[in-house]
């Protein structure tokens, strides 16, 4: 069997005997209240932690063994309402009281007293701890005690140590979170100048306000006139467009089309004049009983009448 296992089996976990207490006191006076590993070697079955806890909680001259006073009870209740089960923090507020003694006193007496009497555990009376962390709190004794020597430091009640860590892991600790206050800043009463959004073309004077909705007519939107209403046309351009349309209607067709028509008419007229000349020649030779016109008289007359009608309608007299 290994040495660590043998040592664990030889550990004594029961209460301390008076002989062990006397030996511990002598060893602390000899080696000081800090050399717990060295002290534990002289006490069979006791570890350094066990020696330290026995000294700090019971054998130290700074530890008070008297009953808790009413003032101490009120201080514990106020501190517990603020810090919860942070017994080491609360013990710094009471001289001569250990965190273990305060915890036992709370669980055995004060907790039941608050639940039975229906107290809120938050006294507003005189005496005890008033919850003001700004004031100087009583000095906490050193962890090892020893002749009432103080560390010379004011420990903050908010710093966890010792039994605070073990109590926080138990699940019954009260958690106090700061409350964030939201402050609403007053907005300026001055109104901003109105903002305008123009939906018209640059040369128009019509403007539409942002905060005023655009009124749309369903018929107008369906007919495709929505763009015309949002983008009005200048009167000058509208007049020019109307004049161009009027010219187009009065002048007939475009220039290219008119050129083609004129060429067709010119060709037709030349053909017509050639037919007339051939008709005249045919008329002069008809007296000799020779030939006649190249086409029948009825067809020639109809063709001549059609050509004369075209020439008269267009108004062309003579074309080269």
From Swiss-Prot:
SUPFAM superfamilies: Homeodomain-like (SSF46689). Induction: Induced by salt stress. Residues 8-63, 65-114 form the HTH myb-type domain. InterPro entries: Homeodomain-like_sf, Myb_dom, MYB_TF, SANT/Myb. Keywords: DNA-binding, Nucleus, Repeat, Transcription, Transcription regulation. Disruption phenotype: No visible phenotype under normal growth conditions, but mutant seedlings exhibit increased survival rate upon salt stress. This is Transcription factor MYB73. GO terms for biological process: glucosinolate metabolic process; negative regulation of response to salt stress; positive regulation of auxin mediated signaling pathway; regulation of DNA-templated transcription. Residues 132-173 are annotated as: Disordered. Transcription factor that functions in salt stress response. Acts as a negative regulator of NHX7/SOS1 and CBL4/SOS3 induction in response to salt stress. In response to auxin, activates the transcription of the auxin-responsive gene IAA19. The IAA19 transcription activation by MYB73 is enhanced by direct interaction between MYB73 and PYL8. Interacts with PYL8. Residues 158-171 have a biased composition (Polar residues). Residues 36-59, 87-110 bind DNA. One of its GO terms (molecular function) is transcription cis-regulatory region binding. One of its GO terms (cellular component) is nucleus. The lineage of its organism: Eukaryota, Viridiplantae, Streptophyta, Embryophyta, Tracheophyta. It is found in: Nucleus.
